[in-house]
């Protein structure tokens, strides 16, 4: 019986893909217990050539070739072809820490949890690895069983929505029709929120098992574009839709709405402060956000009404004023969460 399917999308990672695949086979797992699904997303470089010998050596590796359609469709194809009880998504430039996966897999199988949440380390471009605990608050030691909505109730933190820090029960994903939104950036965020909202049983495990390579993929760098801004709008909308799901406890829905406001504030800061987006494109993003996301306006008090009016009726003026405000937000970006929570309490 295949216990675990490890899905690895591959695109333009010839520098990193071999160490990634090698790390999977340094886990001390029997080949019969897991499979590796490598999804070649039409990569134009030598990525597949770099791992050709590893593929030949292991009968539990399956290669799926597709035209370049993005990581979301690559992962979705992996899900549909997976035979394991549990699924792990790995980015092709990341690494598993030697002999750490069996412990997590054992906890998953024995608990039958929908989702296992674990910790990770980070490796920068200089090769320096930082081991840090970035996880949810645990009341009872190193392992805790909770509902998915408990995870949604927790404060946002670095790595909150990264799919590669989770094991997912395949039956849970299929039964709830959970998949990645195609052709957008930041697909992890919406997927994680939707999974947490549906999960009856999650296991938080204080266990570092994967090394995330940081530096070249950050949205805070110069590669932030109009396309990424629009995709952020889509993600915010999906999160907002969850806040209107009456099947979720009211206090959790307020927290989800609070998160949407936080992402909204961060997006506005990124748009107005990014040199790579033309002013005309910034205006397009503001207009798109205004019509896509439900009521994000401020309703109470003269100051709030003024901000709402400028944003909705005079976006050009709003954008100009917002640029002056950007430096303040850079120092205090998450402080706005408290203000938004007060607005939520007033309007609900």
Question: Can you name each region flagged by the protein language model?
Answer:
Residues 273-348:
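Membrane-interface aromatic/basic loop that binds lipid-linked glycans or pyrophosphate carriers
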Residues 32-42, 62-67, 92:
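Short beta-strand/loop segment that forms part of the nucleotide-sugar
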